[in-house]
């Protein structure tokens, strides 16, 4: 699996801000980076799964859509919520969050984000799934977060079945703090003068 090194992430983010493709694709890419979910989880996301007005916004992904067949909670950073607000202006906020450009009743193509990465000059160097690896590396190396909280946020299942049977903790309070820290870390990787203007990306 092709994945960027953490040192390559700042340049990628700057190139992403210059992306000239469809606006929903741009927003989808930013949302994937902020949440490091799997591509399939993003493509099939429905608005009914999101609780955005809560003091602790969260995305609840149903078990049937998860690789490990277990319901997954994604605490949403302020930045992720702002992305979704912009997405709602495009997709309508009623059914699919990231619909196909050609048919609002069908999900975004499974290769849409990958091809956008290629257009940015990262063919064979990066994939959408690779952001999960980058996030895992940075979060673990920061030594700010419990490894179990990181693994739970990545929706990985404990390989040790005995431990898995006893460790059902969601680590939600820590994961909320971690996801906000991650979003702020991502934003800090760009030069201070580079302010994300979501409106500049065409619909």
Which ranges hold each PLM region?
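Short, contiguous acidic/charged loop-to-helix segments that flank catalytic cores in large enzymes
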Residues: 1, 16-20, 62-73, 99-105, ...
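Short hydrophobic short-linear motifs embedded
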Residues: 196-201
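Short, polar N-cap/turn motifs at the start of nucleic acid-interacting alpha helices
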Residues: 48-56, 123-125, 144-165, 188-194
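Active-site/catalytic core of tyrosine-dependent DNA strand-transfer enzymes
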Residues: 1-10, 75-125, 134, 142-143, ...
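Conserved tyrosine-mediated DNA breakage-rejoining catalytic core shared by Y-recombinases
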Residues: 43-86, 158, 164
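Basic, Lys/Arg- and aromatic-enriched nucleic-acid-binding interface segment
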Residues: 1-45, 55, 67, 90-91, ...
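Catalytic-site neighborhood detector that most strongly recognizes the C-terminal catalytic loop/helix
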Residues: 61-69, 81, 144, 154-189
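C-terminal catalytic core of tyrosine-transesterase DNA break-rejoin enzymes
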Residues: 4, 30, 34-41, 112, ...
């Amino acid at each position: 699996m092709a994945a960027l090194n953490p040192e390559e992430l700042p340049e990628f983010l700057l190139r992403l801000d210059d992306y000239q493709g469809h606006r929903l694709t741009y927003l989808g890419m930013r949302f994937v980076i902020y949440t490091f979910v799997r591509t399939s989880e993003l493509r099939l996301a429905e608005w009914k799964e999101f609780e955005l007005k809560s003091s602790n916004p969260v995305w609840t992904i149903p078990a049937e859509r998860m690789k490990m067949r277990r319901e997954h909670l994604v605490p949403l950073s302020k930045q992720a919520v702002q992305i979704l607000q912009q997405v709602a202006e495009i997709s309508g906020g009623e059914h699919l969050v990231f619909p196909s450009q050609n048919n609002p009743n069908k999900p975004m193509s499974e290769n849409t984000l990958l091809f956008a990465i290629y257009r940015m000059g990262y063919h064979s160097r990066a994939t959408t799934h690779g952001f999960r690896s980058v996030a895992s590396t940075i979060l673990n190396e920061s030594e700010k977060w419990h490894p179990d909280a990181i693994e739970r946020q990545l929706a990985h299942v404990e390989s040790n079945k005995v431990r898995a049977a006893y460790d059902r903790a969601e680590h939600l309070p820590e994961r909320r703090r971690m996801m906000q820290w991650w979003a702020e870390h991502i934003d800090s990787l760009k030069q201070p003068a580079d302010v994300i203007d979501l409106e500049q990306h065409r619909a």
